Swiss-Prot record:
Homododecamerizes. Interacts with terminase subunits TRM1 and TRM3. The gene is ORF43. Residues 583-605 are annotated as: Disordered. It comes from Human herpesvirus 8 type P (isolate GK18). Residues 592-605 have a biased composition (Pro residues). It holds the Pfam family Herpes_UL6. This is Portal protein. Keywords: Coiled coil, Host nucleus, Viral genome packaging, Viral release from host cell, Virion. Forms a portal in the viral capsid through which viral DNA is translocated during DNA packaging. Assembles as a dodecamer at a single fivefold axe of the T=16 icosahedric capsid. Binds to the molecular motor that translocates the viral DNA, termed terminase.
């Protein structure tokens, strides 16, 4: 494990952190839940562990029997049958075969009923050890906190009492069944005691720290230190923890897909708005508004109105010729209301109209020059004040952004993906989503206004993320796909490598069930009845029952001298024998080879 050399006695917080909490939230579907993530549901299915417990208990139960008990139970049953069928003694071969078959099959049915009921109590008991939480911890942070406490004696005693009642009720006179139930009751009690003494807490119940001095991970659960089992060692570099887990490796891609989905939702909300308009500065319309107001509220002969009207028209013209035309129109209009001195006092060097035009032109240009200079000074001062205000506003927004996450009374963040569409449209004026205008400097032009209905390719991102989930889960845990005839995947199951990678550490490291064997991959999807049928065919009890049947169901009585044969010999060439036929034997699940040189048993292939 990579790590720096921190100070003496220091520790690094591993969980909870922003990263570790996000990894668990990904499993809960908070960020970009895609179809490929359903593989995790198959991975955390506890059915494989339940089948492993069933195989362990059923196999050990059938192994706890003795040949003497089996033979004693058979002889008791045979004696009881003879008292009920005394006239069948003449048909010696078929009678014995039928009697033994009925005893063997009823023995099997009774054991199946008792053992299945007994083991189901363990499989569905409310033990605190959770295989699902174990898998969640492994695929996120690669380590599992384990809390040890006293066993649940109430649960153990309840199961034990119920099993003893079943044993007394159904197997009071059977030595073999009684011994099997006694052994399985003891094994179940020990197993429930072990499982109920362990607890895997949820990610919100425990904290994990890394002790840099001892190079160990320590958990804290309800103010008590608990053991943390490391399945895959994380990397710790400069106080930063990088987990060695599938979710850690996919974290960047998952969050990128989630942000793309948020972006697409935001674009959808903006494009859903009924109206959109480009709003410009209103200063260009001020002069026209003033003129309209003056025309409506003032008389036409008002000198102030005429002068102000002149100034407004001059401000709208940006060329010298335009200004000249405005001045000439003004002089022509005003000169009609002034008395011509030439008609009263004679002709001079300059007419009244020419003099008035010259005076007005000089006054107007002087006024415009002063006004323009004042406007430039005002604009420069306002730009400086605006820059100062923008800096203060950005500083305040930065302070608010740092204070809002820690403010418990503040409003929660807007989740655009799950919030109501119309409510989200109303929140577009919120500070987090507000569309602000920008100042376009003089001489610049807007090249792209981004007022297009663009929506990010969220479907492609989710499809890529689905493929990434499938590839990561299949390659990391070696899952086996179940496909149909067309090659379409129907489901996934545990392979033998998956059992070794996940179920092995849970069985031997977490649960400490050292006496239990790992399940074979051929049983991971089989029903309990099919597993029980196979285990019975390969059990010690089946071997003992088969041996008793082969010795009892001979047509020629044992140790009887037949001409041409020694004591106890049977004429195998005449097919004068029979063997027990179990229901599974008839279906071809088991084949018991006859003695060397003998023909096969009836009903076998």
């Amino acid at each position: 494990m990579l790590r720096m050399n921190p100070g003496l006695g220091s520790s690094i917080s591993v969980h909870p952190s922003e990263l570790s909490i996000s990894l668990f939230e990904i499993l809960q579907g908070k960020y970009s839940y895609v179809r490929g993530q359903t593989l995790h549901c198959s991975l955390r299915n506890p059915g494989v562990f339940f089948r492993q417990l069933f195989i362990h208990l059923y196999k050990n139960a059938l192994a706890n029997c003795s040949y003497d008990h089996v033979l004693s139970d058979w002889r008791t049953y045979e004696s009881s049958a003879k008292t009920r069928w005394p006239e069948k003694e003449a048909q010696w071969g078929s009678y014995r075969r039928s009697t033994f078959d009925s005893w063997a099959q009823t023995m099997r049915m009774t054991l199946d009923h008792l053992l299945l009921n007994a083991i189901n109590r363990v499989l569905y008991a409310k033990t605190q050890l959770s295989y699902e939480r174990y898998v969640d911890w492994v695929v996120t942070v690669g380590m599992v906190p384990v809390v040890k406490h006293t066993p649940d004696h109430k649960l153990v005693n309840s199961i034990q009492e119920q099993l003893m009642k079943d044993c007394q009720r159904l197997a009071s006179g059977e030595k073999t069944i009684g011994r099997i139930l006694t052994s399985v009751t003891q094994e179940i009690s020990n197993l429930v005691s072990s499982l109920s003494a362990l607890y895997i807490p949820g990610y919100s119940e425990v904290s994990i720290d890394y002790d840099c001095v001892k190079n160990t991970f320590v958990g804290l659960y309800k103010q008590k230190r608990v053991h943390v089992e490391v399945i895959t060692m994380p990397a710790i570099l400069a106080g930063r923890v990088i987990f060695d887990s599938p979710i850690q490796r996919m974290y960047t891609s998952i969050m990128s897909c989630h942000r793309t989905a948020e972006h697409a939702k935001l674009c959808q909300l903006l494009n859903t708005a009924p109206t959109k308009a480009l709003v410009g500065s209103a200063c260009n319309n001020v002069y026209k508004d003033i003129m309209t107001h003056l025309e409506q509220a003032s008389q036409r002969t008002d000198p102030k109105r005429e002068l102000l009207n002149l100034l407004m028209k001059l401000a709208e013209n940006k060329t010298v010729s335009g200004v000249t035309d405005v001045v000439e129109d003004f002089v022509t209009d005003v000169s009609q209301n002034i008395v011509d001195k030439n008609k009263l006092f004679g002709t001079g060097q300059e007419t009244t109209t020419q003099g008035l035009r010259r005076q007005v032109s000089n006054s107007v240009f002087k006024c415009l020059t002063n006004q323009i200079n004042e406007q430039f000074d005002t604009i420069t001062q306002l730009e400086k004040e605006r820059e100062l205000c923008m800096k203060r506003l950005k500083c305040i927004e930065t302070q608010l952004s740092h204070q809002q996450p820690g403010d418990a009374k503040g409003p929660g963040s807007v989740n655009l993906l799950t919030a109501n569409t119309f409510q989200s449209l109303g929140r577009l004026q919120d500070p987090s989503l507000q569309l602000t205008s920008s100042h376009i400097p003089s001489g610049s032009a807007v090249l792209n206004s981004f007022f297009s209905s663009y929506i990010p390719p969220v479907r492609e991102s989710m499809k890529d993320l689905t493929n990434l989930w499938e590839s990561e889960m299949f390659q990391t845990y070696k899952l086996a796909p179940v496909v149909d005839n067309q090659g379409q995947r129907l489901s996934v199951t545990y392979s033998q490598d998956t059992i070794s990678i996940l179920l092995g550490p849970f069985t031997y490291v977490i649960a400490d069930l050292l006496q239990m064997e790992l399940i074979s991959h051929s049983f991971v999807s089989s029903s309990l009845q099919d597993i029980a049928a196979y285990l019975y065919q390969t059990s010690r009890l089946f071997v003992y029952i088969t041996d008793v049947g082969q010795k009892y169901c001979l047509v020629t009585p044992p140790f009887e001298n037949v001409p041409g044969k020694g004591p106890g010999e049977t004429d195998w060439s005449a097919n004068e024998y029979s063997c027990p036929e179990d229901s599974r034997v008839r279906r071809g699940l088991s084949r018991i080879p006859p003695p060397c040189g003998a023909p096969p048993c009836p009903g076998s292939a």
